[in-house]
């Protein structure tokens, strides 16, 4: 590892000029497969931990791959050999290269990040990594906004777009040519065998997607910091990406000399941008006309600069007071709570009507039921059915599975403003569990519950149910408060599986 660190300690002017030779070093493959990059990237992606890649690794295969890379013609898959062992062998080599490329290309970014935070006392909070941490921010900010632009980020349809995007950040021409060569060769094989699943390393694919999105955000966020409203005029000159960083450094000079008739910008502090799960939202207090201009800007940004056919239907304008916003598995909208205050001055009394605006987050019950039906927990109408494929397991295993699913759902949707839909989902899972156990023992549901008692269903009580029941006393008013309590957890790092149904 010390040899690896010494090889990578280069100055800023040449920090991206020595990536290609790393493909021919055996110790890099060892580091890539035994997760030796912990010091460079402490927050290692979970996609690197793939058991299939580790099982196929050997030093002999690495040596053969390095010899083949010295002669790139041996890595080309001839058309007549696509269905033979040679094609499968080369495809496995591309799999190894994808693992290595994801690690090597991240090296300059990791070193740059480490040098930027070195000597700075930064407080790290793992709570900010939670998905639920964004909802308190939305509750505080979105209550003052009128419209939200919901954008589905498109994927590039041509491989050269990915290569060109990476070219602005990796200056090593040899690495880029080698990356282009391997990517095209892999796609040739993929087109031939369309039934074969992708064997490219998930971390490599994630890096390509993040590079693609980062390029888009580098332009959009640059405009966001200095603007809010874009006039409906041409701004194609701004898409000269090679001179982009020079324009950032000389922003005032550029806009005074070249852009007064091309791009009009106005300051607006009430503009928030959030990206999540392949989508992004833009919230603002703009009028419908200005929101349509933002929509026009997004469409032209993707079509003119990224050469991606971007339909206007991918950008939805939602009015928070009327429309529901689908966000991380929740349906969010603004709710008006009327409040009446009584004020008395001397002998006269006054009634003052106030309206409190609050962001309301609800559970998309129809989407969740559709996901449960897809996984055979209920039918499309939401009626529970037995899980036939689980009847071969033990009773404790079946019960633990249902309890774990129920608690995960309750944990994720604990921030819902109304718990009625959450209770319905719990009911479906409880009855599905009972029907599965009754089917296993060849009994009816009523007879099975009568034999075991109600203690079976107590296992489905979640941790928050038990804690909140201790906080609030047992009364009708307390039960209503418990029904409205919203809990955001700071340990949820992944979307619930049922959220990904759509």
From Swiss-Prot:
Q: What is this protein called?
A: Maturase K
Tell me where it resides.
Plastid, Chloroplast
Q: Which UniProt keywords apply?
A: Chloroplast, mRNA processing, Plastid, RNA-binding, tRNA processing
Similarity section: Belongs to the intron maturase 2 family. MatK subfamily.
For whether the record's keyword set contains Zinc, the answer is: no
The organism's superkingdom is given as Eukaryota
Which gene specifies this protein's sequence? matK
One Pfam family it belongs to:
MatK_N
Q: GO biological process annotations for this chain's record?
A: mRNA processing; RNA splicing; tRNA processing
Q: What does this protein do?
A: Usually encoded in the trnK tRNA gene intron. Probably assists in splicing its own and other chloroplast group II introns.
- Gene Ontology cellular-component terms listed: chloroplast
Please state the protein's primary subcellular location. plastid
């Amino acid at each position: 590892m010390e040899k690896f660190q010494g090889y990578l300690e280069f100055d800023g002017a040449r920090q991206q000029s020595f990536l290609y030779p790393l493909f021919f070093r055996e110790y890099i493959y060892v580091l890539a497969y035994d997760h030796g990059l912990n010091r460079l990237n402490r927050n290692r992606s979970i996609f690197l931990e793939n058991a299939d890649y580790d099982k196929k690794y050997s030093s002999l295969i690495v040596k053969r791959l390095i010899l083949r890379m010295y002669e790139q013609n041996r890595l080309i898959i001839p058309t007549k050999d696509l269905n033979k062992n040679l094609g499968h062998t080369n495809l496995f080599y591309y799999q190894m290269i994808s693992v290595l490329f994801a690690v090597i290309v991240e090296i300059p970014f990791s070193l740059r990040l480490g040098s930027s935070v070195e000597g700075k006392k930064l407080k790290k909070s793992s709570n900010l990594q939670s998905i639920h941490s964004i909802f308190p921010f939305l509750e505080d900010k979105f209550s003052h906004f009128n419209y939200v632009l919901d954008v589905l980020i498109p994927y590039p349809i041509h491989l050269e777009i990915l290569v060109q995007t990476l070219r602005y950040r990796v200056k090593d021409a040899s690495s880029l040519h080698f990356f282009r060569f391997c990517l095209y060769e892999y796609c040739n094989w993929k087109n031939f065998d369309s039934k074969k699943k992708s064997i490219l390393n998930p971390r490599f694919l994630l890096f390509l997607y993040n590079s693609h999105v980062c390029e888009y955000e580098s332009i959009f966020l640059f405009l966001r910091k200095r603007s809010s409203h874009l006039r409906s005029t041409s701004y194609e000159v701004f898409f000269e990406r090679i001179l982009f960083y020079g324009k950032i450094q000389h922003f005032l000079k550029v806009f005074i000399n070249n852009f007064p008739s091309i791009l009009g910008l106005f300051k607006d502090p009430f503009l928030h941008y959030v990206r999540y799960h392949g989508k992004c939202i833009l919230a603002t207090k703009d009028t419908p006309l200005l929101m349509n201009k933002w929509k026009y800007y997004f469409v032209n940004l993707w079509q003119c600069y990224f050469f991606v056919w971007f339909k206007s239907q991918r950008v939805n304008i939602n009015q928070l007071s009327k429309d529901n916003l689908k966000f991380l598995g929740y349906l969010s909208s603004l709710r008006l709570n009327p409040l009446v205050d009584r004020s008395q001055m001397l002998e006269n009394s006054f009634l003052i009507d106030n309206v409190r605006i609050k962001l309301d987050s609800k559970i998309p019950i129809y989407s969740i039921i559709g996901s449960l039906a897809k996984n055979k927990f209920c039918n499309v109408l939401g009626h529970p059915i037995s899980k036939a494929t689980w009847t071969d397991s033990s009773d404790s295993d079946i019960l633990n599975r249902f309890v774990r699913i129920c608690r995960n759902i309750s944990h994720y949707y604990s921030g819902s403003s109304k718990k009625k839909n959450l209770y319905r989902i719990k009911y479906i899972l409880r009855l599905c569990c009972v029907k599965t156990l009754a089917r296993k023992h060849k009994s009816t549901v009523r007879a099975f519950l009568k034999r075991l008692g109600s203690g079976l269903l107590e296992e489905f009580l979640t941790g928050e149910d038990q804690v909140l029941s201790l906080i609030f006393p047992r009364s009708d008013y307390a039960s209503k408060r418990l029904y409205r309590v919203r809990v955001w957890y700071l340990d949820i790092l992944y979307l619930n599986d049922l959220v990904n149904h759509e």
